């Protein structure tokens, strides 16, 4: 199941290209989040939504830039800049941005980067909204005034350490990166890791970083969303006060890239040096977020590997007891998505054995599809996940995030009802068609990650 913070429809960024959703089932309540959207003269988009359940306000700022937008040889810049944004600006001292927010009682305070966007968010008591807006505006408009070579070098080392811990010394970390590289080969912008490569991080100069900021961190390339208990007129005045005077500029062009198409099965072997158990990973290209087939892919991922009754878990973990764990997911991204299956073997079980069993499950799905009970369970899971997030104004999956996500993907913040409806509209035939058309054995990447003692038994690569 995708997170709402997952991606932006860049190459397909028009409302008309969103997956058409049928009406909700009769008797289902039509949900919506009331909002007002407008734009400042400098191009900054603003979305306001009042929610008076609690005296708090979520400030959520999205910049329309992620790893997808990075130039060759500049991987990791979007994520590196997420770090730099907390290091102080012209009117905010070094390393006090977070502490200033914590002093006023901020929660859900963070920044995240993925392939399609970078965001910054915090939830504050309503009477401290102005402080949060001032802090966000100061780093949007005046970060470069305080950016130094020393700060850059410090954060480069922090990010490089993150890469060591999250990729290079993490179980299957390098294996997963190798799989992704094969699924999205150069020159596709999804090829590089969000965290970047050591080589590119080492090469990043102060001038490079400043140029990245000037291009992508302009008001015209950002959306500010405020959700919670606030006075609309006063908040508009505050937004104008702190953001309206920032210089504008053109909205940067987004890369336009043709979808990648696999024409054969690509087999990759990886000698796993961190984990002690073999792992099998399979990956296919899949429809972009909110386009036709995206919801069916989510449903199928749930049927395959969510819960003890799921197809792969029941067969591989419970019945045959050859797998330690199974995962399946539709990683929905803006330009093109990825459907992945990951199985960790039990001791003594080869990845070839896992592959045969996974293929047997997939072939059964292609022939017979899923059951109505499985479809209903997947629908309920998505509804529950979505609606539970809406209980909060901020944080991951909260109202501010939801409004930002839909606005980011299709330019329309009020897509909640349609999003829920598209899952209700998925039919048994839709899922069967997806399995047959998208999860073909002749258009996928298969990775065998095997620890050294068992490595000789792993299949040879055919790259």
Where in this protein do the model-derived segments appear?
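Sec-dependent N-terminal signal peptides
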Residues: 3-13
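Proteolytic maturation boundary segments
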Residues: 11, 15-48, 231-272, 279, ...
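Histidine-acidic residue clusters that define the catalytic metal-binding segment
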Residues: 20-36, 181-222, 254-259, 288, ...
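M16 family metallopeptidases and their MPP-like homologs
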Residues: 47-49, 54-72, 76-80, 94-142, ...
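Active-site His/Glu-centered metal-binding helix of metallohydrolases
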Residues: 77-85, 300
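Short, polar/flexible loop-turn hinges at active-site or ligand-entry regions and domain interfaces
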Residues: 87-90, 141-150, 370-371
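Non-catalytic, conformational "gating/processing" segments within enzyme and secreted inhibitor domains
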Residues: 149, 156, 210-242, 443
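His/Glu-based metal-binding/catalytic segments typifying zinc-dependent metallopeptidases
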Residues: 164, 169, 181, 251-309, ...
């Amino acid at each position: 199941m995708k997170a709402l913070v997952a991606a932006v429809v860049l190459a397909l960024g028009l409302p008309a290209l969103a997956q058409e959703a049928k009406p909700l089932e009769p008797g289902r309540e039509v949900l919506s989040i009331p909002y007002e959207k407008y734009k400042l003269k400098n191009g900054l988009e603003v979305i306001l939504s009042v929610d008076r359940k609690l005296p708090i306000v979520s400030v959520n700022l999205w910049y329309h830039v992620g790893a997808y937008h990075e130039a060759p040889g500049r991987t990791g810049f979007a994520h590196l800049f997420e770090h730099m944004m907390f290091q102080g600006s012209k009117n905010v001292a070094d390393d006090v941005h977070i502490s200033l927010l914590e002093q006023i009682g901020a929660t859900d305070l963070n920044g995240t980067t993925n392939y399609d966007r970078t965001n910054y968010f915090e939830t504050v008591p309503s009477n401290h909204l102005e402080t949060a807006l001032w802090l966000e505006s100061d780093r949007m408009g005046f970060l470069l005034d305080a950016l130094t070579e020393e700060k850059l070098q410090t954060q480069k080392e922090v990010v490089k350490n993150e890469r060591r811990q999250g990729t290079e010394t993490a179980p299957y970390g390098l294996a997963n990166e190798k799989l992704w590289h094969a699924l999205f080969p150069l020159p596709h912008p999804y090829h590089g890791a969000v965290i970047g490569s050591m080589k590119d991080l080492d090469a990043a100069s102060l001038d490079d970083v400043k140029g990245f900021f000037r291009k992508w961190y302009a008001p015209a390339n950002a959306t500010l969303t405020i959700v919670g208990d606030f006075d609309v007129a006063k908040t508009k005045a505050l937004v104008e006060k702190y953001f309206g005077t920032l210089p504008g500029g053109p909205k940067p062009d987004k890369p336009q890239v043709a979808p990648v198409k696999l024409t054969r099965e690509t087999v990759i072997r990886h000698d796993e040096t961190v984990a002690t158990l073999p792992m099998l990973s399979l990956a296919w290209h899949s429809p972009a977020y909110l386009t036709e087939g995206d919801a069916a892919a989510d449903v199928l991922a749930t049927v395959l590997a969510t819960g003890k009754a799921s197809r792969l878990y029941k067969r591989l973990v419970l019945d045959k007891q050859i797998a330690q764990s199974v995962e399946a997911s539709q990683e929905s991204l803006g330009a093109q998505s990825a459907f992945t299956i990951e199985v960790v073997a039990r001791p003594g079980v080869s990845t070839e054995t896992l592959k045969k069993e996974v293929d047997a499950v997939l072939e059964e799905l292609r022939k017979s599809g899923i059951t109505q009970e499985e479809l209903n369970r997947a629908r309920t899971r998505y509804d529950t996940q979505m609606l539970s997030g809406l209980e909060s104004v901020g944080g991951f999956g909260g109202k501010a995030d939801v409004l930002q996500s839909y606005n980011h993907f299709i330019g329309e913040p009020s897509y909640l009802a349609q999003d829920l409806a598209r899952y209700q509209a998925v039919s048994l035939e839709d899922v069967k068609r997806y399995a047959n058309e998208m999860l073909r054995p002749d258009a996928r990447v298969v990775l065998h990650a095997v620890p050294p003692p068992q490595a000789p038994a792993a299949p040879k690569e055919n790259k």
